Amino acid sequence: MATDTAVTGAPETTELRLASGNGPVTRTVLRTPVRDALPSEVPLIDISPIFSTCVADRKAVARKIHDAATNIGFFYIQNHRVPSQDIDLAYSASQDFFRQEMEVKVEADAKDGPFDSGYRGPGTQRVNPTEGADLRETYSILYDPMLDPTVPDPANIPEPASRFLHLGRAPFESTATLPHFKDAFVRYFQACLVLARALTRAFALSLDLPESAFDGKVQYPDASLEINFYPPISTGHAVSAPGDADTRVSIGSHTDFLLFTILWQDSNGGLQVLNREGQWIRAIPVEGTFVVNIGDYLQRVTNDKYVSTVHRAQNFSGRERVSMPFFWGFGMHESCQVLRNCCGEDEKSKYDEVKCVDWVSRRLGNLFDLSDKG
């Protein structure tokens, strides 16, 4: 792994190199043991008021989201209205899928590259080009308006949006060995759509915008549900920071590149967040919650007011781990530009307007580049 160690007294630091849509970037990381996050570092927010008819209640939650988004870029949410039964069914179905023989799983292979739904096997993805290939398997479902109850007739979607959409392309026919699989994931996907749209309006409020400010940009979103299967890492010890010997990652150090991510994780843990001080902290599983993290779009539109935070996963639990991230962003036909109210009088915009399809293409190109950049 490519890192440079600097001795500046105690503790030592190392430079973590990351791929981004703007080229390589670095973060300074403390070479200290990974520790559990404090409640103040990754706060728990009760979001039930965002479903209230009272705007004052919704604004109160938006203020808490604003604080979390500016300080760490990660927070837990509870009372999110995603039925526990839907979560349990999706989790059970994911375990059933990944425990099949490889020759069965590859029947659902994502054959058309990064813009396709389906299965990706071990060693096929590398989120961070200076770290090892991700030690995971995945199955993903891209946004399909045929699965979106808010779209009455996909045939009437305007062409600028429809050309980026994936109508009927999820390879559910290749999961026929698991009759319950499709129903479980469609139900969970639809529940995540509802939650993501509610959170989008809460984020708009958190920025002192009308609640509907982003509605048009997510009418036909760039969204995907991904299930990750992480076998236990067999090194026998967790490393404290990039650059230590025998470092292996379940998923490498990265930021998410859309608007935000809604993550469900099982009880085995493994998610680590790089805080502002440069220390890796564990976002341990909290029953009944999701983890929400800010993506690159929200950092860009807020002119760096909100933080798209570096994170990774290392499964040293000794057990199989499953996580189910739901990635949510503006439609691929939309663009992303800095909001006027996020620039002070003498503050310049740090980012040019970018087409969402161009941004996503750049980031996905890094994800599937398995060449050694170390």
Swiss-Prot record:
Lineage top rank: taxon: Eukaryota
Gene3D superfamilies xref list: B-lactam Antibiotic, Isopenicillin N Synthase, Chain
PROSITE patterns attached to this UniProt entry: FE2OG_OXY
Pfam entry (one): DIOX_N
GO annotation (BP), single: small molecule biosynthetic process
Catalyzed reactions: peramine + 2-oxoglutarate + O2 = 8-hydroxyperamine + succinate + CO2
Swiss-Prot/TrEMBL keywords: Dioxygenase, Iron, Metal-binding, Oxidoreductase
Name by which UniProt lists this protein: 2-oxoglutarate-Fe(II) type oxidoreductase ppzC
